[in-house]
Amino acid sequence: MKHSQPRGLSRRRVEHLLSETKNDRSTGNRVDVLSRHFLGHSYKPNPLIGSADTAEVFTASLDGFDCVTYIETILALARAVNVDDFIEWLRKIRYAEGRIEWARRNHYMTLWIRNNVRTGIIRPVSMPAVPMLIRDRVLNVVPGLAAQRARVKCVPKPAVPRLAAYLQSGDLIFFVSTAKNLDVFHAGIIVRAGKSMLMRHASRSQGLVVEQELSEFLKANRMTGVMVMRPQGVPGRIAVSNQVRGLSMRRIRCAQRSDGAKRRGGK
């Protein structure tokens, strides 16, 4: 059974994107190809709809992103075989247990990572020869959300160049904040280009989805360190949940508004 058409989302556009990678069984390659497609698209601050006192609306936009919705969209496309799969994977990636509620949204990236590791969508990249740092944080930057304790394990900034031996195109990189009340301040997708290590990301400062040298971003930004995750699995159908099947067109909207700065803003 097909979903109701999300307002503003062209099924043909999603189908075209999926057709470009349908014969590639490597999730990393699919992430690489799909993330390239959106270079030059607009950065959209606060792209999600919902708050502590506003009903959550499940949104799916291919027109503009913050750093997190860019990654979520690419991951969902990379795992999907059709439009309904794309919508379902996006729901599972964005919300704890796939439940479309503001309180269940993965507001902080440590939670986002933990829940997506648990469901087998991503896994940590093994880097046995790279030093790791552990920092405890109390996360409290989202209005209306109770403070959460988080333990952040990351590669310290000075050691990031040593990651070159381990990273692959399609890996996800998360930049750990120096603030004691925030875990991650930005995220992107790694691309290997010969000896160069590039990153694709929705850049707030440039107003676009861009590709740049990872070293340039590291030089320009203060951070404690980075975390790296690798997308898992191959494309496959996913059972359509009753929650999404029953959503009206009012509840699924392709939107270009509300939630980015509160929800770990992009650089």
PLM regions and their residue ranges:
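Cysteine-nucleophile amide-bond enzymes
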Residues: 1-267
